[in-house]
Amino acid sequence: PDQSLYAYDSVPTMVRRINNTFKRADEIQWSRGINPGDEGFIDYFLPIVADAEAGFGGVLNAFELMKNMIAAGAAGVHFEDQLAAAKKCGHMGGKVLVPTREAVEKLISARFAADVMGVPTLILARTDAEAANLITSDYDENDKPFLTGERTQEGFFRVKNGLEQSISRGVAYAPYADLVWCETGVPDIGFAREFAQAVLAACPGKLLSYNCSPSFNWKKNLNDSQIASFQEELSALGYKYQFITLAGIHVNWFNTFKFAHAYARGEGMKHYVEMVQEPEFAAREMGYTFVSHQQEVGTGYFDDVTTVIQGGSSSVKALTGSTEEEQFH
């Protein structure tokens, strides 16, 4: 579950793996003689935005985590203002905020880490104050207007969650981050507008982020027309970085489920051909290349490396005589 229940270095490790994949794709392209400026050249080194959660501890943890993210190749990193020890997905209950000042200090830690590394890196500040109704401490003047006077059995203070608390934190974070993001429970243009207007009034030109989350039931909240125009309306309000968390995994799981369900009904390979292979062939004209999966992962590239090492010819090249060479070209 999305509760920081994994090792501190898990995300930097994943960023490194993604960047290694980009490097391999670029190497394969280069080995084919395709260079920048050539027709068909693809810049594979897309910017990676990495999730630092709540920093996995205090300011020093955030500092070291940011350094590791940068070393792994992250172009942007986002930090949220929850208590790291009780961190939850933004669409779960039981979220506990840290004081505004503590969250700001983690953003300062991240910026300092980027300065120390000498690498320009985007910092995204996320607040969970729209839904979070608990906070660890009552000392911060920025948080006092939202305290209810109640405490929980764990000793946390209850706060009034919602738009005003979100604005208070978004405005506080804006000077210390390149982008500001407020996690919300529903796709609400009205909420997004008020948050954006308040942050931009305090910090003109600040870029905003928005999570178009699959945790929203989109059709329960908006009609088809509203869904179709939602992201353009967000952009007009200043939300220049919009993303769908977990889009890829939902696509993978759903389509794998559909195929497995069809396959299990009988005539197994018929469904693979109709649902996967033939659509893959048809998608080639749009630029799809994974039909030739051996070539995609670098087999041809390593054949070239083998040929060079062996003086210009080799009898052990992998693609030569393969089913991929014979049937997919």
Put a short name on every predicted segment.
Residues 232-261, 267-299, 303:
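Substrate-binding cleft of secreted/luminal carbohydrate-active enzymes
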Residues 1-243, 257, 261, 299-329:
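Alpha/beta enzyme core
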